[in-house]
């Protein structure tokens, strides 16, 4: 899934 942490996009 796609998440957004502190303005940083991460893919898991």
Curated annotation (Swiss-Prot):
GO cellular component annotations of the record: extracellular region
Tissue expression remark: Expressed by the venom gland.
Location of the protein in the cell: Secreted
Sorted UniProt keywords: Secreted
Primary location: secreted
Name of the featured protein: Cryptide Pep-16
